[in-house]
Structure formats: C-alpha cells, structure tokens
C-alpha cells in the first residue's frame, strides 16, 4: 500500500510540477520572438544604445575620464 501511495504522489504531484512551464520563462521567449521580427536597423539601434555615452560634466569629472570628454 505504501508503494502505491508513493507512486501516486510521484505521478500526481511531482511529475506535473516538473512539467509546468514557469512564468519567468515567458518574457524571455516573447522578447526573443519580438527581436527576431525586428528589422536589422532596429536591432542595430538596440544593440548600440547601451554603448553610447554622453560627456560628463566637468564638476563630476575626476582623473578617470579617458575619452577626453572632461
């Protein structure tokens, strides 16, 4: 009887939990699909946007500015 209870618990509780798709996985897949549907120019703009950096203000500048901005 104990073996049957263990088998029922595994198949009715643990197996469905292991096969559920987590909600956290959904946005990543949706983002990848939306990104695939973008034009190459839009994709390029998104990829290059984080690299763009404006000049810092002279008041904030310390000796760490290597780009000659300060």
Curated annotation (Swiss-Prot):
Expressed by the venom duct. Keywords: Disulfide bond, Neurotoxin, Secreted, Signal, Toxin. Disulfide bonds join 55-65, 56-69, 61-70. Its main location: secreted. It holds the Pfam family Conotoxin. It comes from the Eukaryota. Residues 25-53 form a propeptide. GO terms for cellular component: extracellular region. Residues 1-24 form the signal peptide. The keyword Endoplasmic reticulum does not apply. It is found in: Secreted. The cysteine framework is III (CC-C-C-CC). Belongs to the conotoxin M superfamily. This is Conotoxin VnMLKM-01.
